[in-house]
Amino acid sequence: MATVENRPGHATHEVLNQASALEDYNVFESDRVLHAALHREGGGWAEGRAIEVGAFAGSAQAQMWGREANENPPCLRTHDRFGNRIDEVEFHPSWHKLLSVGVGFGLAALPWAEPQPGAHVARAAMFMCFGQAEAGVGCPLSMTYSVVPALRAQPELAAEWEPRFTSAAYDGERLRPAQDKAGALAGMAMTEKQGGSDVRANTTSAVPLNGGGPGGEYAITGHKWFCSAPMCDAFLVLAHAPGGLSCFLLPRFTPDGERNRMHLQRLKDKLGNRSNASSEVEFRGAWAQLVGEEGRGVPTIIEMVNHTRLDCVLGAATGMRVGVAQAINHCSGRATFGKLLVDQPLMQNVLADLAIESEAATIS
């Protein structure tokens, strides 16, 4: 790797011995382990797409967008300047640019939009490449990808919403009814303050409207301590119906075009994943539809959870790969004690250990 050339502008010193930025390279083509895994696991037909994603993710443009999205985190706007409740999250334009590209690549829908052997493998490889540009946008992409199998428990809801969730068009820069948009994104809200992962301890309630039942209407009242990607168009939520803990599809807008009674309380102050908004919410009689049977909420929503957990693993492996790539790039452009760091025996051992751990994470 080339080092940064000396540039004028410092009266006191010269800038020397600094590695160059790792950019304008192909993330996929430079990862022989991921390339081999894609072919070995049945996704080789998508190599061309993976190369395209890899070229974007490694580009200076994508890397800049990623930095900008993290340096300018999302901001919650509960009310407009006239005092009206709006419950919106504002993102830096780079967030929307990245998300638009990710949706266009099919990272939110490929296995459902183009079902064929190896489709999940292909998407996984592309997801890992894309995450090396910016990881936060992976949350709404993952949630949207994961909602489809759970939503299919209620065929009429799937018929209405699946075409929106599998669209290759991103239409999320402005909050408006999903029926007026070219594409939609999905989120999830399960956790409550008192229960955490013990969702059986949830207290949020669902009251049937017009009889309720599978696909029927309910009013949701309660809270969620963690709501993923709150600017999405619809969410799977858990609430206690008369028949027990149940799964519901809760959109940001009601069928008549009014904002649903889903009120964002605050955004989480997180250690990482800062470009992406995670929120606390309250439902005050919010309109929702039952997905599946009453009392079958956990088995229904677990279909979504399982797929998101796959992406959690992919995200961790992606982070490891980024760390290795950045470390090797730095050590290839910085010298110490008369040698490049990459040529120092002790550093070679460290880099080899990191590379082995990254390879193991990728293939497992």
Question: For each predicted feature, which ranges?
Answer:
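Extended, charge-enriched "interface" segments that sit outside catalytic cores
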Residues: 1-116
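Internal helix-loop-helix
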Residues: 84-173, 228-229, 358, 362
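Buried hydrophobic positions in well-ordered alpha/beta secondary-structure cores of metabolic enzymes
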Residues: 147, 188, 206, 220-222, ...
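Internal maturation/activation junctions in enzymes
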Residues: 157-204, 208-209, 213-216
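Short Gly/Pro-enriched turn/cap motifs at secondary-structure boundaries
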Residues: 194-197, 226-228, 240, 270-277
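A short core secondary-structure module
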Residues: 216-261
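A glycine-rich, basic-preceded beta-loop-alpha segment at the flavin cofactor/substrate interface
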Residues: 256-258, 265, 280-308, 325-343
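Extended amphipathic alpha-helical segments enriched in small hydrophobics
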Residues: 309-364
